[in-house]
A protein has these predicted regions:
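Cofactor-centric catalytic regions
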Residues: 1-20, 24-44, 56-174
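Generic long, charged, amphipathic alpha-helical segments
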Residues: 49-55
Length: 174
């Protein structure tokens, strides 16, 4: 079912530079939340210690797809990447003003904004963004490409990838 091939994320940045991220996946011991925290941190150019993944909540990220195999990491991680890309674009003008350079020169890495041969701490950028009344929350979305299924003709590709498994039992009868 193609409708199960989508993911969402809610990203909120606080003026102190801390980040709250909610996604539609379900953590059940596979390390999904740790993976999503790392994706979020990498996308913003900050340390994972600044990111808090909050419990899955359909009031924050509605209509989530099922979490199965690695699809939870792929689909929700891509939604988080979409959200962090939006936020970087939103913060670039703030950082550019602070650094006296072009928005095109701004990059985020090592918990700093860099541009024009200078840098400013992430926390200073987020505080200035808050003072400038820049929205510090975004929603991210992702849908897997190249899928289409015709339920009448029963053909097509309903999922981007499939889960496979195998079980083996060795039995000794006495």
């Amino acid at each position: 079912a193609t409708h199960l091939n989508q993911g969402g994320a809610l990203l909120v940045i606080y003026m102190d530079g801390s980040v709250s991220c909610n996604h539609g996946g379900t953590e059940m011991g596979q390390g999904l939340n740790n993976k999503m925290a790392q994706v979020c941190a990498d996308g913003l150019g900050i340390g994972v210690d600044k990111v808090r993944i909050t419990a899955t909540d359909s009031q924050k990220v509605p209509n989530a797809s099922a979490t199965s195999a690695s699809s939870g990491a792929d689909i929700n991680g891509a939604a988080i990447m979409n959200a962090t890309a939006q936020m970087r674009e939103r913060l670039k003008p703030v950082a550019a003003r602070m650094l006296g350079c072009s928005e095109a020169d701004i990059t985020f890495a090592n918990s700093e904004a860099h541009g024009g041969g200078k840098s400013v701490k992430w926390e200073e950028v987020t505080k200035q963004a808050w003072l400038d009344r820049v929205g510090l929350s975004v929603t991210g979305f992702y849908m897997t490409p190249e899928i289409k299924y015709d339920f009448i003709k029963l053909n097509g590709r309903a999922f981007y990838y499939y889960c496979y498994g195998a079980a083996v039992s060795e039995v000794e009868i006495n």
